[in-house]
Amino acid sequence: MESALPSIFTLVIIAEFIIGNLSNGFIVLINCIDWVSKRELSSVDKLLIILAISRIGLIWEILVSWFLALHSLAIFVSGTGLRIMIFSWIVSNHFNLWLATILSIFYLLKIASFSSPAFLYLKRRVNKVILMILLGTLVFLFLNLIQINMLIKDWLDRYERNTTWNFSMSDFETFSVSVRFTMTMFSLTPFTVAFISFLLLVFSLQKHLQKMQLNYKGHRDPRTKVHTNALKIVISFLLFYASFFLSILISWISELYQNTVIYMLCETIGAFYPSSHSFLLILGNAKLRQAFLLVAAKVWAKR
């Protein structure tokens, strides 16, 4: 049974790869069509396009890394190839996490209602705020790349001094764990920011519901529905990201202790986030949901 597990996990990874490319490709396609037809696009739709593209890149990185790890081929990659592979992973993962976090901030500034002058100032300049945050995250990306490059250089120097198979395999595993740990630490910041956005949205919704109960008893309020939909999107991101974060954390621990089964399981769970969360974004967006249902109806009618 254990010998069949790599094949089973590989099939799951491939399924996640297909779902992820279809869902993220759908987001890009529909928004680009809308952009061409209307000659304009909202800020949230632009964020979704960039987020979907970054996730497509991340999904491809996950697939390539999976097969390299499965067949122990990563150690044979050249220094330049190793840098390209790891840097591509870092860049796609960086924008994947930060753009989803920025989306949470966007919903907070657009939907939440606070009387704080600072919040009102940011709310009036939401597009500039989003752009400044996006540019500011490049500092984290730059620092992450510098740290990883130092780890790569250190490992390559040791590898050139001692090229025996046993040393190379054990040292590469230690190097891989160090890379994962560094990436995990840099991933904590966007998760924390998204979590704070979620708490502020909850607080804003609670205040709004209390106000509605006092002043508008018996009436349905569309703003409450907007709050709820935004919370669903942010909660789904937090839950998927938490599973992604924990899977990475457990996978580098299992890799350190050479537990192959746990490592493969965690890698499979981690790939679920960029593949499936985009599908929830489609269902949570009125335009994308309508287009998806239309396509699904046409496909079903042809059967």
Swiss-Prot record:
Keyword terms, alphabetized: G-protein coupled receptor, Glycoprotein, Membrane, Receptor, Sensory transduction, Taste, Transducer, Transmembrane, Transmembrane helix
GO cellular component: plasma membrane
SUPFAM superfamilies: Family A G protein-coupled receptor-like
Similarity remark: Belongs to the G-protein coupled receptor T2R family.
Function text: Receptor that may play a role in the perception of bitterness and is gustducin-linked. May play a role in sensing the chemical composition of the gastrointestinal content. The activity of this receptor may stimulate alpha gustducin, mediate PLC-beta-2 activation and lead to the gating of TRPM5.
PANTHER family named in the record: TASTE RECEPTOR TYPE 2 (PTHR11394), TASTE RECEPTOR TYPE 2 MEMBER 13 (PTHR11394:SF28)
Protein's UniProt name: Taste receptor type 2 member 13
Glycosylation site positions: N162, N166
InterPro entries xref list: TAS2R
Disulfide bonds: none
Top-level taxon in the UniProt lineage: Eukaryota
Annotated membrane topology: Multi-pass membrane protein
Key word Transmembrane present: yes
One GO BP annotation of this record: positive regulation of cytokinesis
